[in-house]
Every structure is written in structure tokens, then in C-alpha cells.
């Protein structure tokens, strides 16, 4: 008997594929409002500073393919079939749902490549996927709200952080601090009771505990260029503050809200934060991003299988 096919909808933010895509990509992010030329030029300069266009597109596709492969290795009951849906560039989330529907997929598990829940991020992806499926009359989509607390995800980061601290001489370690960060969001999410900031705090606490790190702080990065207040402190300001007030001279940055090498990490951390550490005479460290690391892919696969099992349990 043929195995049942289950769709695997992997959703991510998306990134420009080539320089010509930058304008339309950021216009989509800005809800159809074209960015000023000055902003486009600045973005092009940032991409060039990290060696050309972001590697994110290739990494996202590789993560999705590896996840599909791992899921089909881990169990033999269903055949997972992967569909990639992006938020701000093709293939859009709606395109992926349409393809699932056209292929006759009846049910799918959806996972967003972002560990923490927020109405701005995971919620908006899931709503778009469900709305598209509803419009077409299928498939049924089982969404995942968050997965930051999956043990293998925390293990990935705590092992990487521990390795950096372990390699330091004792004196340096005493003056080193871990900065755990995620993408900043508008402050108004707090008034709405969004769990996003608390989830990042929880992630930082668990990683620090597992890595045996006593000095750590939570920061935010890559805030949008809008007049409204965004979550802070920004990682650059936090770096200066920790140096000035507590005398730290080594900084280990763990941008755990992201899962791959891309502009926010390769520029905002590896260029901007590094410049700050150089200005204050401190050392800069940043663990490797998860990308397609087998432990990270295992974490995602475990989350997907748990979600499918939960659906099965509820129908028994």
C-alpha cells in the first residue's frame, strides 16, 4: 500500500535573488510603497559589503530540502513532500499552497524558519497559508506557533557558545559576556501581550545555563527604519553599555532569532557590531549560524513530527 503523502510547507522571509530584485523586494516589505532611492542605494551597499547578494536564498532552499529528507528518514508511515513559501518574494506562501492543492495534497504541516512566536512573524505567515488554503478548499494545514524551546535547537546554540567560551583563557572568560539577540519589532507588540520578548529572554536563559555561561544579556537588532519605537536595547548600544558600565572586553553574539547566514547577521553583527567592539578595544565572537547543521535539521524535524502526531492523537 502506498504511503500517505503529507505536505511540508516550509515558510521563510525570502531575500533578493539578484541586485535587480532589491527594489521590488523592499517595496513588498513596505506594503507596496517604493523605498526612497537613498535607502535602495544603502541596501545595495550593504549587500556588496557582505560579498554580494545574501546567501540566504540558497541556504533556505537547502534547509527545506534537508528537512524533507530527514523527515522521510526518521519515520516510515507517511511521505513528506516539501513546498517552499516565502513572505516577500516568489515563490510566495500562496504559490506554495496553490501547488500543494494542484498536487492533490490533502494535509500539510507548516513550519516557519523563525523560532519565536509573534503576531508580526509566525502568526502572519500561518494566517496567509491558512487563508490561501481556505480559498482553494484545501489542503488542511497544521501550523506550528513556535519551536524555540525544542531541546535540540537549544543544544545547537549552547554547544556553539560553550565551545567559544571554553577556548578562552580564564582571564578573558571572566571579562566575556554573551549577547543573545533576535530581530527587533515595534514596541506596540508588548501592549498587545505578544510573547515574543519573553520567549527570547527564556531562550537566552536556557542557552546560558546549558553552556555554563554566567554573564549574559538580551539585545535586539536590525530594527526597521520607521518613526515608531522598536524593542531595545539595540545590540550595538548594549555592547557599549556593557563595556562602559561593567568592563567587559570580549563579546560573544548569538543571534538566535535567525537561522541562517544573511544580511542581518553578516552585516548587522559581523560588520556593525564588530566595528563597535573594535572602537572600544574589545574582542568579537559570533558562533556559526545553524544553516543546514544536522542537529538543527533534526530539531526542525522533531518539531514537525510532534505536530503531526498531535493531530493524529486528536483524531483518535
Swiss-Prot record:
<dbReference type="InterPro" id="IPR019772">
    <property type="entry name" value="Ferrochelatase_AS"/>
</dbReference>
<feature type="binding site" description="axial binding residue">
    <location>
        <position position="13"/>
    </location>
    <ligand>
        <name>Fe-coproporphyrin III</name>
    </ligand>
</feature>
<keyword id="KW-0479">Metal-binding</keyword>
<dbReference type="Pfam" id="PF00762">
    <property type="entry name" value="Ferrochelatase"/>
</dbReference>
<keyword id="KW-0456">Lyase</keyword>
<dbReference type="GO" id="GO:0005737">
    <property type="term" value="C:cytoplasm"/>
</dbReference>
<feature type="binding site">
    <location>
        <begin position="46"/>
        <end position="47"/>
    </location>
    <ligand>
        <name>Fe-coproporphyrin III</name>
    </ligand>
</feature>
<keyword id="KW-0627">Porphyrin biosynthesis</keyword>
<feature type="binding site">
    <location>
        <position position="30"/>
    </location>
    <ligand>
        <name>Fe-coproporphyrin III</name>
    </ligand>
</feature>
<keyword id="KW-0963">Cytoplasm</keyword>
<dbReference type="InterPro" id="IPR033659">
    <property type="entry name" value="Ferrochelatase_N"/>
</dbReference>
<feature type="binding site">
    <location>
        <position position="264"/>
    </location>
    <ligand>
        <name>Fe(2+)</name>
    </ligand>
</feature>
<feature type="binding site">
    <location>
        <position position="54"/>
    </location>
    <ligand>
        <name>Fe-coproporphyrin III</name>
    </ligand>
</feature>
<comment type="similarity">
    <text>Belongs to the ferrochelatase family.</text>
</comment>
<comment type="pathway">
    <text>Porphyrin-containing compound metabolism; protoheme biosynthesis.</text>
</comment>
<comment type="function">
    <text>Involved in coproporphyrin-dependent heme b biosynthesis. Catalyzes the insertion of ferrous iron into coproporphyrin III to form Fe-coproporphyrin III.</text>
</comment>
<dbReference type="GO" id="GO:0046872">
    <property type="term" value="F:metal ion binding"/>
</dbReference>
<keyword id="KW-0408">Iron</keyword>
<dbReference type="InterPro" id="IPR033644">
    <property type="entry name" value="Ferrochelatase_C"/>
</dbReference>
<feature type="binding site">
    <location>
        <position position="125"/>
    </location>
    <ligand>
        <name>Fe-coproporphyrin III</name>
    </ligand>
</feature>
<dbReference type="GO" id="GO:0004325">
    <property type="term" value="F:ferrochelatase activity"/>
</dbReference>
<dbReference type="InterPro" id="IPR001015">
    <property type="entry name" value="Ferrochelatase"/>
</dbReference>
<keyword id="KW-0350">Heme biosynthesis</keyword>
<feature type="binding site">
    <location>
        <position position="183"/>
    </location>
    <ligand>
        <name>Fe(2+)</name>
    </ligand>
</feature>
<dbReference type="GO" id="GO:0006783">
    <property type="term" value="P:heme biosynthetic process"/>
</dbReference>
<protein>
    <recommendedName>
        <fullName>Coproporphyrin III ferrochelatase</fullName>
        <ecNumber>4.99.1.9</ecNumber>
    </recommendedName>
</protein>
